[in-house]
């Protein structure tokens, strides 16, 4: 017996032939909805409540029209940022100019990514579940699809969850919490326990007026809906040029060695090119200052400019102190390598601690570092 969804689909398509253009597209969309209401009802429900449905953006606009029955599911196209760009070009261009678009490249660039259990890498709850927001090449997409990792290719749906694709959802700090939490990136814990986050929660509970100031992640990092998310300080708060403070410059150089960007002699390595490609660090004063100025302007909407500048300088000073502690730890472990107490792993380029191995560092003391 033929699949009833297939029979329904063909019958509706036959009727669609009577109406050209938009009417035909609408009939085809109705066929998708009728079939998927029995298979994936919540997907249909989300779409029906979306701005897409309200504006008559049908299933085939994102998934194509080749998939017509349960027997040809593989013909359904999976959305990518380019799909979204057909209507949201400005937002996709902004996204690709920001750090979120580089998340996939950053995950693949780490030296021990391939060491991780495949269940961790391929699952939605593992590292790549969040890093999948990054832009991917056509070849990378094909490889992921071949492994059955086809969800989340659109990147946009990391924040605008499919198939509602809600701007309201993506405008909430809870959308950011999905990835920006935990011991290795505790931004949610810092925000929710700070004054900004507390006021946002009080406002949500109705304890504050709806027009009360309660800055969210998006308020400060996506002003006016700009999707080009970027910060002044990069990964591990490393940037160039080196500071004028000689001690701080020396400590920063040690950290760059620990990141493998410089070799133990202080000379640039091939990793510097990866840092440039993934924009892991701000590599000029001009680039750093641009982001700092933008943040001061944002803060000044609620605070005096002098207050904003002073608080940001306090943060800079905290980084200076933390750099000193980090550099001391790196030099201590480097000394253990130099004295032969720790042996150089075969996969290491130098007898020197590698910070990018994170929890995969070969010794307990390095893991603590």
Locate each region found by the language model.
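Positively charged n-region of N-terminal signal peptides that target proteins for export
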Residues: 1-6
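Short sequence/structural segments immediately N-terminal
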Residues: 22-369
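Bacterial N-terminal signal peptides
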Residues: 8-17
């Amino acid at each position: 017996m033929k699949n009833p969804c297939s029979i329904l689909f063909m019958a509706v398509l036959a009727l669609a032939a009577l109406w050209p253009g938009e009417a035909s597209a609408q009939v085809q969309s109705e066929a998708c909805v009728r079939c998927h209401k029995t298979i994936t009802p919540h997907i249909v429900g989300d779409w029906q409540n979306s701005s897409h449905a309200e504006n008559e953006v049908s299933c085939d606009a994102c998934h194509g029209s080749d998939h017509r029955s349960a027997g040809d599911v593989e013909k359904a196209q999976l959305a990518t940022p380019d799909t979204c760009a057909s209507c949201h070009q400005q937002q996709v261009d902004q996204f690709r100019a920001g750090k979120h678009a580089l998340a996939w490249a950053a995950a693949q660039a780490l030296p021990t990514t391939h060491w991780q259990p495949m269940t961790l890498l391929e699952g939605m709850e593992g590292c790549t579940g969040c890093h999948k927001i990054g832009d991917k090449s056509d070849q990378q997409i094909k490889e992921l699809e071949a492994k059955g990792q086809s969800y989340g290719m659109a990147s946009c749906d990391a924040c605008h969850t499919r198939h509602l694709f809600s701007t309201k959802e993506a405008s909430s700090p809870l959308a950011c919490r999905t990835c920006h939490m935990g011991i290795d990136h505790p931004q949610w814990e810092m925000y929710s326990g700070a004054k900004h986050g507390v006021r946002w929660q009080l406002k949500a509970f109705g304890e504050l007026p709806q027009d009360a100031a309660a800055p969210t992640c998006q308020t400060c990092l996506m002003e006016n809906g700009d999707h080009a998310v970027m910060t002044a300080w990069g990964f591990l708060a490393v940037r160039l040029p080196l500071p004028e403070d000689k001690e701080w410059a020396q400590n920063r150089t040690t950290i760059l060695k620990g990141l493998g960007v410089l070799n133990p002699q202080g000379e640039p390595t091939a990793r510097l090119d990866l840092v440039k490609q993934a924009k892991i660090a701000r590599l000029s004063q001009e680039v750093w200052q641009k982001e700092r100025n933008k943040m001061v302007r944002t803060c000044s909407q609620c605070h005096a400019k002098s207050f904003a500048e002073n608080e940001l300088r306090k943060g800079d000073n905290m980084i200076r102190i933390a750099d000193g502690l980090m550099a001391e730890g790196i030099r201590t472990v480097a000394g253990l390598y130099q004295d032969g107490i720790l042996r150089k792993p075969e996969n290491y380029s130098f007898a020197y601690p590698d910070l990018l191995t994170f929890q995969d560092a070969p010794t307990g003391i390095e893991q603590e570092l």
